[in-house]
């Protein structure tokens, strides 16, 4: 039986009519009497976890009459103190979205392409989809080609260790590819190269007196949004908040001062601030040290003898000054940043005078040369002694978890051999150091997978699975992904919505939603506390959906066992026993539950948490009811006492940590570090490669032909790219400053619009070096002249009838500007470039 796309939509519409219009809500209700008035006293609050952004807030859902009707933050959470942000409410519409994929489906049109109807039809008999997938994997094993299996990950839980990690190894492939390099990897290098921490920072907002929100919007995106919303006014009352961004975001609109910097000139501003702090003698003597004679010898343009300075907890302050900072004056920076000299001097002085109760909270900085920019920014946190100080910033707290069972005894020789092959994303090659944790080849180069697939370099891929990912939409120059996935012979997509990537799937498996339908464990941190929180089903499933990381693993293992490869099933059956009863799992749901119990055991088992200093629970039922375990509060200055996890055990202005990684990468590829810099498109040569230094912007498009810099911004309503089919997303779009409800717009400064003869609401053609898009113009003073800003999220031709203009005909609603942004990278980290105005565009009336 074949179902055309429009017939599939008609079926969805029938469910939607029941969900939206029926007075009895009989798709969900336990009785046919209809819904009575709902009072606050009715129902039960069930804890789970929101994963709409990278905060991962513990939340609760009010369950009334078999319907999840309300959401709020978990009152026991010390990360958000019971507060939540606006995007969480969209979970209600996501759960009951009539356009969700409801049953496993298969492709019947062998031709793949963006404009090709896949002609999907549902599996009606048994579980044939699992037979098909298992057959493809067995074929790889038979031909000793297990390395040609690829798993691509989007949003995930701790259980990704099972599906993304261990399952891939059991099959025999090195190719588990994370989405993280199109998310926020560059910012991690700022703290990694200076203080040895590869991760997101935490902030002591309760005691902070001066906050610079730099290229990020803590009130809308990035991390710990509810905590920032609740506490930013306190920072302003005690001192000052400054926002650095080419566009007035939510934080900038709240802050006492907004610095509309030119795109990609972040490093210049940071270095000029360092110059001011150093020449004025405002650096932290307690943390950095001082001249032996007590006299400041740092004078603009003049070098200093290293032996004259006695450093304490830092490495290379004088070398950094001599090589770079001495010439980076505010006067120089004013010319390249667009921020006047007096403002640079004043803000730098204010920041240092508030130390150590100050911090720079910086964002992704996903620019082609972003690693060195974030090193410059984070160096300021060290220069004033704010790192690991009360009122400043820190690495944050971890949270308890127990280990997953090991796979070693179950991984056979075929799998071991296959897993030793190179990864498909080309990490570790000369042009992609991809230095996660400053070690070559330990990062990921997500967006480059498309090019690797097209070139079959290092080899071709024959079987691919993707879950909670939509790289054809979320990756820059997405047309590459269209061509690449069209080449893959067999692709399975595990998602809740029919996305742009799903168009290329041979089998579509409907995914359970993390927050309301699945079992999982989530760990995160905010507000100086770490936490482990639960995800659990809060309503009975309406559709034939499965938890990807657990249930799909089990169902696939069952089929592989039936076909003669029983290792995977034996691993799951023997090792994932219920830690309370010792019972072996007998089906996919039991496995999901037991895996969650195993991972969280240290949270709820009185024996395992006996020595834990944070929250203590009394049994699994207690964890299900409370939903969270909070860590103790972070203790400051432990690294001051014990040392930083860098090569020198100090905060590094001259990064021996980065130097070690770059030298290792150069040696592996039989070149010099200078040749690495050249191959990866950085300007640094010699010692500059090891210090925070200025790199001029790398821009696609000559300024004369493409005069405007494109600013890619994020909506406070985006839920990991899967919320645009919610009507509330569009109804409240103006909560993103400068945007318009029910519209997708390009923000243009009125002064620029006047020169172009463009009026409010005009349709404009936006052209880059790789293509053009048409979108509605929005005239707004909140975007810097010479820049245009577009919010990521809209422009779907898939996802559903709200998200697309015409879902049946695959007509997009709005424009996805990833389609005209070239595929480029910060190659030290492997991160995709999307920030810093690296794409030049020209604007014309359509």
UniProtKB/Swiss-Prot annotation:
[4Fe-4S] cluster binds at residues 50, 53, 57, 85. Pfam families: Molybdop_Fe4S4, Molybdopterin, Molydop_binding. Binds 1 [4Fe-4S] cluster. Binds 1 molybdenum-bis(molybdopterin guanine dinucleotide) (Mo-bis-MGD) cofactor per subunit. The keyword Metal-binding applies. Gene3D superfamilies: 2.40.40.20, 3.40.50.740, ADC-like domains (2.20.25.90), Dimethylsulfoxide Reductase, domain 2 (3.40.228.10), Formate dehydrogenase/DMSO reductase (3.30.2070.10). It catalyses: arsenite + A + H2O = arsenate + AH2 + H(+). Arsenate binds at residues 156, 180, 188. Disulfide bonds: none annotated. InterPro entries: Asp_de-COase-like_dom_sf, MopB_CT_Tetrathionate, MoPterin_dinucl-bd_dom, Mopterin_OxRdtase, Mopterin_OxRdtase_4Fe-4S_dom, Prok_Mopterin_Oxidored, TAT_signal, TAT_signal_bac_arc. GO terms for cellular component: periplasmic space. Its cofactor is [4Fe-4S] cluster; Mo-bis(molybdopterin guanine dinucleotide). GO terms for molecular function: 4 iron, 4 sulfur cluster binding; metal ion binding; molybdopterin cofactor binding; oxidoreductase activity. Heterodimer composed of one large subunit (ArrA) and one small subunit (ArrB). Component of the arsenate respiratory reductase (Arr) complex, which catalyzes the reduction of arsenate (As(V)) to arsenite (As(III)). Can use acetate as the electron donor. ArrA is the arsenate-binding subunit. Belongs to the prokaryotic molybdopterin-containing oxidoreductase family. May also use zinc as a cofactor. This is Arsenate respiratory reductase molybdopterin-containing subunit ArrA. It comes from Chrysiogenes arsenatis.
